[in-house]
Amino acid sequence: MEWKIVVPLFAVAFTVANAGLIGGPMDANMNDQGTRDALQFAVVEHNKKTNDMFVRQVAKVVNAQKQVVSGMKYIFTVQMGRTPCRKGGVEKVCSVHKDPQMAVPYKCTFEVWSRPWMSDIQMVKNQCES
């Protein structure tokens, strides 16, 4: 008789534990336009803050998540690297140097808060380490 109560309770607990928190961060699809736009915004803002004369680009997306808040918060962990393109240049495509000594790779965490109905997007975290 007790197993009729215990088994369903375990099933519910297992389902809730594997579903993640409602409203918590979840994996973001890099093929989603909103995710790509948020990452591009983060890279542009990051480049505005660097003292380097060369543009930095994403070499690799390590992790991408999104969270429903009052809008959408995107959380990216990325490997960044230097490109041969100078800031203010006219180049449209700037790939990260293949040579690690030229690319000077480093890891960053970016958080972007997007509220499209207000035409508002903000960088809320721009933290990098060598």
Swiss-Prot record:
A motif (Secondary area of contact) lies at residues 67-71. Keywords: Disulfide bond, Protease inhibitor, Secreted, Signal, Thiol protease inhibitor. It holds the Pfam family Cystatin. The record marks G23 as: Reactive site. Disulfide bonds join C85-C94, C108-C128. InterPro entries: Cystatin_dom, Cystatin_sf, Prot_inh_cystat_CS. Its main location: secreted. It is found in: Secreted. Residues 1-19 form the signal peptide. Gene3D superfamilies: 3.10.450.10. GO terms for molecular function: cysteine-type endopeptidase inhibitor activity; peptidase inhibitor activity. It comes from the Eukaryota. GO terms for cellular component: cytoplasm; extracellular space; vesicle. Cysteine proteinase inhibitor. This is Cystatin. It comes from Oncorhynchus mykiss (Rainbow trout).
